[in-house]
Amino acid sequence: MKILLKKLHMENFKKTKDQTIDFGHITKISGQNAVGKSTVADAFMWCLFNKNSLGEAKFQVRPLDAFGNPIDHVEIKVAVTLDVDGREYELTKTQKQNWVKKRGAMEATLQGNDNLYEIDGAPKKEKDYKAFVAEIIDEDLFQLLTNPQAFVSKKWKEQREELMKMIPGVDNDTVIASNPDV
């Protein structure tokens, strides 16, 4: 399967108010520290897997004000356009705050965030969206291909399992038979 990242659009994602990146076969993203390079990778991973580029599920996606406080009442949106074997798909994740005004209360209170998902503009349930993404690429494999720390951060047994998946058909008996000193 051939997968190409064609476009990434971010709205109110971390420090990025509104940005679209059109990707070519080679796209260079560079800059000084703290200008948003990792934000691009985080947005991509958040849209596909609900994690940042380090594989962490809990991280701040909401933009912050000058004092480091989350900015409320803004919609966070990331749209990714992928070419999968010649067919384009647009995957979109939007996060909205759930504000509820209880009876008798003067102000609404934040009751959490709602994540909304779309594939090619059609709303999808989270499980259907995740299943669609999983058909394109396995999250663990994607982490191994894109994050140099993904493999070394695994426990040795998990590392061994990953290596054995990459070289199928080799079992312990074959290895032992090939080397009499083992």
Which residues are covered by each model-predicted region?
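Alpha-helical scaffold elements adjacent to nucleotide-binding pockets in ATP/GTP-utilizing enzyme cores
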Residues: 40-43, 92, 128, 132, ...
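Conserved ABC ATPase signature
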Residues: 30-35, 39, 116-126, 155
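Extended, Lys/Glu-rich alpha-helical coiled-coil stalks
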Residues: 142-182
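Pre-Walker A-like glycine/lysine-rich segment at the N-terminus of P-loop NTPase domains
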Residues: 1-47, 143
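Nucleotide-state sensing region of NTPase/ATPase domains
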Residues: 57-144
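Post-Walker A helix-loop "phosphate-sensing" segment adjacent to the P-loop in P-loop NTPases
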Residues: 47-57
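A short beta-strand motif that forms part of the nucleic acid-binding face
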Residues: 23-25, 94-97, 167
